[in-house]
């Protein structure tokens, strides 16, 4: 197996990524999850988290580690992913990134985007801190969140001090990491999984029915009973947010909610494939027909 190799396995919701991973040899690779809902504790069924069986077969990272009220974004993913890559290389394990978030895959491969625009709320907050607590407080805060940037700029350059904090507060990523962007990952094997759209529609319908059979309704009631609601970041995921409509419209039929989940899932699959098709140098496979070829590529 090539030294320092990194594998990407991506494809739309319900394409069959988990089935592929069950065929991995034990102890050779570890999975880094590339999904924005499976990261949350308690939100299990509609997020289609890797099964206990799969997680026992091959270790997974970035699954089930955030509280539902916490925000998850590119900055958190990128920071965690880079650390995991380094740790796995020390252990001589193969990092395999698996999921459906094309946005995260793109920026992991090609580096972070240029420093983003900052909301007026963040800018006002930083200015308020400067007015009420002074420059030294901002410097101490910068030292805490981005020591590299703190060391590299003049302690009297209030513009850069403020800007550095604005970027961190907006994204969760130190500005020093943005300034290093363009450092593309090398030795990436990108494998895409795809099926005909009618096949995908059938699989989505089966998946949603299985969610209901596995207790999704009970999970939703439990989550709402704990006080989670439309402001909870984890509730933004498909399969969860639709039930908030049911909560506000109790006379809606469960069947209507199920049909809405199927519809939203299929639209999401289309958006995913549009984004994935723009990523260059991807080897595309049907996950059922080409299983041996895929495994040979990954583990040679």
Swiss-Prot record:
Enzyme class, UniProt record, top EC level? transferase
Q: Which residues are listed under the site Interaction with substrate tRNA?
A: 101, 123
Does ATP-binding show up as a keyword for this record?
A: yes
Q: Name one GO biological process term.
A: tRNA modification
**Gene3D superfamilies membership:** 1.10.20.140, P-loop containing nucleotide triphosphate hydrolases (3.40.50.300)
Q: Kindly list the cofactors needed.
A: Mg(2+)
Recite the UniProt keywords alphabetically: ATP-binding, Magnesium, Nucleotide-binding, Transferase, tRNA processing
InterPro entries xrefs: Dimethylallyltransferase (IPR039657), IPT (IPR018022), P-loop_NTPase (IPR027417)
Q: Does the keyword Amino-acid biosynthesis apply?
A: no
Please write the reaction equations for the catalytic activity of this protein: adenosine(37) in tRNA + dimethylallyl diphosphate = N(6)-dimethylallyladenosine(37) in tRNA + diphosphate
Q: EC annotation?
A: 2.5.1.75
| Positions of substrate binding | 13-18
- GO-annotated molecular function: ATP binding; tRNA dimethylallyltransferase activity
Annotated residues that bind ATP are located at 11-18
Show the segment(s) annotated as Interaction with substrate tRNA: 35-38
Spell out the NCBIfam families in the cross-references: miaA
User: Which function does this protein serve?
Assistant: Catalyzes the transfer of a dimethylallyl group onto the adenine at position 37 in tRNAs that read codons beginning with uridine, leading to the formation of N6-(dimethylallyl)adenosine (i(6)A).
| PANTHER family found in the cross-reference section | TRNA DIMETHYLALLYLTRANSFERASE (PTHR11088:SF60)
Please give the subunit comment from the record. Answer: Monomer.
Homology family: Belongs to the IPP transferase family.
Protein name, entry field: tRNA dimethylallyltransferase
